[in-house]
Amino acid sequence: QLLRVYIDGIPLDLASQLLPGRTKLGLAGLAVHIHLHAKAQQQYSDKQVSQAQAVNLSKAGFRNMLDSLEKTIQPLKWEPQGTEWGNYYNITNYSDDALKTKGEIVGRFVEKAAPRTAWDLGANNGMFSRELSRRCVETTASDIDPAAVEQDYLAVKANNEQHLLPLVIDLTNPSPALGWAHHERESMLERGPVDLVMALALIHHLAISNNVPLTSVAQFFAFAGKWAIVEFVPKSDSQVKRLLATRKDIFNKYTEEGFEEAFSAYFTIEEKVSIPGSERTLYLFKRK
């Protein structure tokens, strides 16, 4: 969210305020590159400096500074705590066999659609995104949870994966066009459309948690991609029951029939498969 506001980078003084106090200790690393630099910037912000007083850093000096920055950044690690979906696949109601079968069905759908580009929305740690990327589909895997995206990113980095880009995106409040005249950074939708949109275990969160009508979800998917792989999770599923436990069930159209009706306005149902060992159904849609 900070990078939406500061598209050229987070200001030094703000970064200095946000970092833990322990990073101010020592004479190297973050203490120098962030805190001392921010202090010096603030000290000289209202002072005039002549050209003669300006310090010209040599090429070697720039290289040394970059080396120091790299050595400061490389050891930094983030251990996320208390995030919503970072541990999702350890607590989901899918059995190992059901997860495996689900992956096989998704893979078959991908091969049938034969996309070159794809968005996996609500991708979590990218488990099923790899059914796309391993088939050389240029895939953006997005999720609202930074911990899940971090897991995905670390796996991409460790395995040198070339076709998968993990991003933190809140689909109910996606990245808008930013910058001068809204042209410096394109919005999420302006970066599409793609050949295929995938939304697994996501529809119930959009429709129930965020009150987005199924017709609006279908319209968005049709705008974003030619094909769609969508998982429908019924009200009888434990995850939907959990969502409805704290709110009144006003979602009369959230049924399998209502879901198919909403999506049929924009797509044809190419294939529909129930996932064994679960109450969920996978759909392959093609835009009309």
Locate predicted features:
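A short, conserved alpha-helix within the catalytic core of class I
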Residues: H205-F221
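S-adenosyl-L-methionine
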Residues: Y153-R191
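Conserved class I S-adenosyl-L-methionine
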Residues: A114-N124
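N-terminal auxiliary segments of SAM/dcSAM-dependent transferases
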Residues: Q1-K77
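Conserved beta-strand signature within the Rossmann-like core of class I S-adenosyl-L-methionine
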Residues: F220-K235
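Conserved SAM-binding motif I beta-strand of class I
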Residues: E138-D143
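Conserved SAM-binding loop of SAM-dependent methyltransferases across substrates and taxa
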Residues: N125-V137
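A conserved beta-strand element that flanks and buttresses the S-adenosyl-L-methionine
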Residues: M198
